[in-house]
Amino acid sequence: MYGSARSVGKVEPSSQSPGRSPRLPRSPRLGHRRTNSTGGSSGNSVGGGSGKTLSMENIQSLNAAYATSGPMYLSDHENVGAETPKSTMTLGRSGGRLPYGVRMTAMGSSPNIASSGVASDTIAFGEHHLPPVSMASTVPHSLRQARDNTIMDLQTQLKEVLRENDLLRKDVEVKESKLSSSMNSIKTFWSPELKKERALRKDEASKITIWKEQYRVVQEENQHMQMTIQALQDELRIQRDLNQLFQQDSSSRTGEPCVAELTEENFQRLHAEHERQAKELFLLRKTLEEMELRIETQKQTLNARDESIKKLLEMLQSKGLSAKATEEDHERTRRLAEAEMHVHHLESLLEQKEKENNMLREEMHRRFENAPDSAKTKALQTVIEMKDSKISSMERGLRDLEEEIQMLKSNGALSSEEREEEMKQMEVYRSHSKFMKNKVEQLKEELSSKDAQGEELKKRAAGLQSEIGQVKQELSRKDTELLALQTKLETLTNQFSDSKQHIEVLKESLTAKEQRAAILQTEVDALRLRLEEKETMLNKKTKQIQDMAEEKGTQAGEIHDLKDMLDVKERKVNVLQKKIENLQEQLRDKEKQMSSLKERVKSLQADTTNTDTALTTLEEALADKERTIERLKEQRDRDEREKQEEIDTYKKDLKDLREKVSLLQGDLSEKEASLLDIKEHASSLASSGLKKDSRLKTLEIALEQKKEECLKMESQLKKAHEATLEARASPEMSDRIQQLEREISRYKDESSKAQTEVDRLLEILKEVENEKNDKDKKIAELESLTSRQVKDQNKKVANLKHKEQVEKKKSAQMLEEARRREDSLSDSSQQLQDSLRKKDDRIEELEEALRESVQITAEREMVLAQEESARTNAEKQVEELLMAMEKVKQELESMKAKLSSTQQSLAEKETHLTNLRAERRKHLEEVLEMKQEALLAAISEKDANIALLELSSSKKKTQEEVAALKREKDRLVQQLKQQTQNRMKLMADNYEDDHFRSSRSNQTNHKPSPDQIIQPLLELDQNRSKLKLYIGHLTALCHDRDPLILRGLTPPASYNADGEQAAWENELQQMTQEQLQNELEKVEGDNAELQEFANTILQQIADHCPDILEQVVNALEESS
């Protein structure tokens, strides 16, 4: 399948007649059957390398070369190797095989002429090993040029086929990599959703079958081309033998004078060929980098040149030319030999590359021979279907994660405010617990003093028994007071139990905080996954851009193919012009070379048959190319539809996300209102605590008064017992408070970890932004390539139009000259008739020479009949040539239509690129907005934390925390500055892109019309008004905050210059082209000044008042 044309087996003798050319296969399927049936060894089919059919120029030049080549003979005893195959045409008794241009001498006077066939591979490529005598055949320059052209055509088609094979190989490798990656995950992944996605599997399987069918069609085309090359080579060999026979016949009739004329013409032709060869060598030196695939053909052409030079030298020496001419020929041969040595050196370098190409072909052959069976293909299809289902599930998860991100944003803001409120409540509860501890200690001291007083009272009880009677009344009164105090104590114990319940509520709130922190951690993980999915989306976008670049490459290849086809058409026109010139020369030399007319008429008839076959094969090749172009267009339209569907889905997702953001903002407002209610409740709790403190103070005063009056031991013991119970309860409270403090410190650590995670995610967002900038550069490069291709196509269309006009003029001149020739022929026939009449008169006078005169008249009549037949044939050929010219014109018109369609497709691609650029801008703006919102939320959170710490107390630890929070706040402010600068830079880049696009559209035409200049002027004026509005927002913010920010800044003159828009537009309509150009430059300068002034204001705001950057962002959004 990948072999070259040299690997041909033995050729069996053909059953065709010598005068008929072998029939060419009409379709690649027929060629495929023939190669399979004969195994590449029959006379009509050859398995080998790919190539194109010979053009009409090549066929004509080959026929002319064989017609003018001189005879050369082998000795009677020289034979070619015994293993050479048989001839396709046995005209004589000799069975040996000869290289092309070499003839065998006739062994006797038999009518069967001794000529031997040569193998097609030796004729085509010259790879035969014969003695030096047999290598002396004439190969003129036209044959070498024809071979070079055919081999170059074959090489271009081989390159195309190899390129298609490489593309198919890349597709196969991509599929293999996808399958290998999915096989690892397929073992652990299985879901019932795969049943719903069988349609996707079928689509993938159909794509694979289509690729295989394309590869099979390419192989069949290669085989078809190989068969056509072999058939044309056989036909050339037959034509060469016929030309040799006609040359022998003509040489036996005309004699030596005609040979002398032919040799002189050959010498002149050789001189012209030598000049052409010098030019060709100069071009070859320039194009050495493109000789990787031509070196193999150069070997055969150089061998043919050696043989032709040796033959020509021997011919010149045998005809007795001067010594000077021989010296000149020797000098030419020496130069040619030097050039050949240089080319041989290059050949040795490029043979290695040929070996590498053969190795790659064999690998491809083995891969496609060892293709997997149906079971493996089914398994691969199932893997692909599972992979597609997994991709769909990941897309659903992506949507869910986007919703969770929006929830996280709102919950992040809420959690920061709730943390602030909780910190305040904890500080209040901590101060209240300290106050309660102090109270318990005071009560303990009072109980100890009361115990001492009780012991003193016991000692004094004996002395006071006499006074008991008097004090009983006082005791009854004191009992009532004690009962009142007991009720008060009960109320205090109830309050203490309430404080315990409040502490339990605080514990529950702390557990809720823990749960919320865990939820925050999960949301952070979800954010990380969301960022990874965003990266995958960006990778998909890059793949889409690469696919666009590949499509552009394929379009460039199609344009290159169209160029090649145009070159082929130009060659056909040149061939037709050369044919007309040859016919004119034949009409001039009719009287001198009557015998050569017979041979040339027969060669022209053979040329017509060859041209018909070549034209049919070329038409079939063109039809195949058009089918492939239509197939590629359908595939491109399919890809565009898929991309449009993806864009619509992305737009729908964005709309959903925006709706969710609006809902979340409403939730935020509701939660802020609830936070305000909670703050009011906290203030009320603080006031109730103050009231309780005042009540406690009053109770203490009452207790002091009552302690002085207490005299009984029983009441003191009861008080001591109650005090001991309270003392037991107080250390449990202190332990609980310590536990709460430890939990608060742990929650602080977790919040710091969450902050570090948020910082890491921000860094990942920066990396994503850098990748997007790189992709923007790639898109700009692709746009420049498309513009260059469009310019080249416009130039080529203009050149084609010019060439058509020149060809029309030449064809008209040729027709006029042909008519003149016909008139001159009619005059010559009248003169001949007059001479015949005179000879009839002389017959009457000269009766003695009657027999001689009768013979002369008969011969003259035969000559006249031949002239008339030749003239009719020439007229028919002129008509055929005119028809061919009309066909060429029609083909050129079709090529123009194809060029217009390619230009339209390029315009569509440009519009698609502009849409992609607009989407990229939207994505960048959204990313910058998200970053700015996150930074503003973090700054507000830091401010709240700082305020809480400043309110709590003035310990060193809190001061350090406040300093750390301030440093973090400064860092966040710097990041917010950077983000605002990035957004300003993005606006400036968008403005510069629009300006560059408008200037580029204006530069495509050398002299733009006034209407083309007015449109960019209006766009620039619109941008100028936007910049003025933005500068007005910034200056208003600066004046509200601090007018000193704008100190030293003076706005440009264009900022204060205001005019009526309608009047300015009317003035533009009345301006000349030069005035419009000056106005365009002025407006561009004004826009540049305004942009620079806006950048300076923004820098001043960032330096002096970074806390109003949020308002600057709002101004940006309003101006955009």
From Swiss-Prot:
It is found in: Cytoplasm, Cytoskeleton, Microtubule organizing center, Centrosome; Cytoplasm; Membrane; Golgi apparatus membrane. InterPro entries: ELKS/CAST (IPR019323), FIP-RBD_C_sf (IPR037245), Rab-bd_FIP-RBD (IPR019018). It comes from the Eukaryota. The modification N6-acetyllysine is found at residue 10. Residues 40-51 have a biased composition (Gly residues). Residues 144-992, 1060-1104 form a coiled coil. The keyword Hydrolase does not apply. Keywords: Acetylation, Cell junction, Cell projection, Coiled coil, Cytoplasm, Cytoskeleton, Golgi apparatus, Membrane, Phosphoprotein, Protein transport, Synapse, Transport. One of its GO terms (molecular function) is structural constituent of presynaptic active zone. GO terms for cellular component: anchoring junction; cell projection; centrosome; cytoplasm; GABA-ergic synapse; glutamatergic synapse; Golgi membrane; podosome. Residues 1050-1112 form the FIP-RBD domain. The modification Phosphoserine is found at residues 17, 21, 37, 55, 75, 94, 824, 1009. GO terms for biological process: protein transport; regulation of calcium-dependent activation of synaptic vesicle fusion; regulation of presynaptic cytosolic calcium ion concentration; retrograde transport, endosome to Golgi; synaptic vesicle priming. It holds the Pfam family Cast. Residues 801-824 have a biased composition (Basic and acidic residues). Residues 13-28 have a biased composition (Low complexity). It is a peripheral membrane protein. The modification Phosphothreonine is found at residues 38, 1050. Interacts with the GTB-bound forms of RAB6A isoform 1 and isoform 2 and with RAB6B. The interaction was strongest with RAB6B, followed by RAB6A isoform 2 and weakest with RAB6A isoform 1. Part of a complex with CHUK, IKBKB and IKBKG. Interacts with CHUK, IKBKB and IKBKG. The interaction with IKBKG is independent of CHUK and IKBKB. Interacts with NFKBIA. Isoform 2 interacts through its C-terminus with the PDZ domains of RIMS1 and RIMS2. Interacts with ERC2/CAST1. Interacts with SDCCAG8. This is ELKS/Rab6-interacting/CAST family member 1. It comes from Mus musculus (Mouse).
